[in-house]
Amino acid sequence: MNLIAKLEQEEIERALAGKTIPEFAPGDTVIVNVNVVEGTRKRVQAYEGVVIAIRNRGLNSNFIVRKISSGEGVERTFQTYSPLLASIVVKRRGDVRRAKLYYLRERSGKSARIKEKLVSKDRTAAASQE
């Protein structure tokens, strides 16, 4: 492992101190809680939407979440290891066949729906036994 990769790995571990980032994939509906500073006040803002892309680049990893706000599509890019992220909660698993769901930008209504990934009973039983 070269020096830059080692430093990057240390920074990732430092950024994750006390935080856990759940496994999520494109198509999943997530709630991202972001720390927002307004003047002297600090508050947590929730942003809920569908993950349309994940970019894995070490410390520079990010993901794009898309939601419909007042009938208008809004996309926001989050840095995965940012200290501004309070938490990420996976609300629903989506069943898609693409890594990047940019085609959702042109779609609205029923055509923009994503099937839900149903976990079989065998997998849930195996997961609970471990």
Curated annotation (Swiss-Prot):
One of its GO terms (cellular component) is cytosolic large ribosomal subunit. Transmembrane segments: none annotated. InterPro entries: Ribosomal_bL19 (IPR001857), Ribosomal_bL19_CS (IPR018257), Ribosomal_bL19_sf (IPR038657), Translation_prot_SH3-like_sf (IPR008991). One of its GO terms (biological process) is translation. Keywords: Ribonucleoprotein, Ribosomal protein. It comes from the Bacteria. One of its GO terms (molecular function) is structural constituent of ribosome. Pfam families: Ribosomal_L19. Disulfide bonds: none annotated. HAMAP family: Ribosomal_bL19. Belongs to the bacterial ribosomal protein bL19 family. This protein is located at the 30S-50S ribosomal subunit interface and may play a role in the structure and function of the aminoacyl-tRNA binding site. This is Large ribosomal subunit protein bL19. It comes from Burkholderia ambifaria (strain ATCC BAA-244 / DSM 16087 / CCUG 44356 / LMG 19182 / AMMD). The gene is rplS.
